A protein has these predicted regions:
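Catalytic nucleophile serine of serine hydrolases
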Residues: 111-113
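Short glycine-centered segments of the SAM/dcSAM-binding site in methyltransferase folds
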Residues: 108
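Extended, subdomain-level signal for the structured scaffold at the beginning of enzyme domains
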Residues: 1-105
Length: 113
């Protein structure tokens, strides 16, 4: 019996839609359960090309839940090059905490930028 992996997906605002949707499609096609967490103070985010979408939750809700997932996937976007300007925002502090938590639990942490 093969157990399905469960993945937490982080999406910045704005996110690279092509990258995000490729991840989500691959997970869907392979029967891998996932939840998308917005790296923002709200669930509603956008893609680099202006498409609006609603994530399952925000990154704040992912804190303390690394044991619920096998992997953390970071989906990059135009928000990352200007990260330094917003590094002190609560959602970016939550992002760093979540990455640290997943790494500390020896979870797979992957992404693209």
């Amino acid at each position: 019996m093969v157990m399905a992996k469960k993945v937490a997906v982080l999406a910045v605002d704005p996110v690279n839609g092509m990258g995000l949707f490729q991840y989500l499609e691959a997970f869907y096609e392979n029967g891998i359960p996932y939840r998308v967490y917005a790296v923002a103070d709200r669930r509603e985010i956008g893609t680099n090309s202006g498409i609006r979408l609603t994530a399952d939750d925000t990154v704040a809700a992912l804190k303390g839940h690394a044991d619920d997932y096998d992997a953390l996937v970071f989906s990059c976007g135009d928000a990352v090059p200007v990260f330094a300007r917003h590094a002190g925002e609560p959602y970016n502090l939550d992002l760093m905490e979540v990455i640290r938590e997943f790494a500390g639990r020896d979870r797979i942490v992957i992404g693209h930028c």
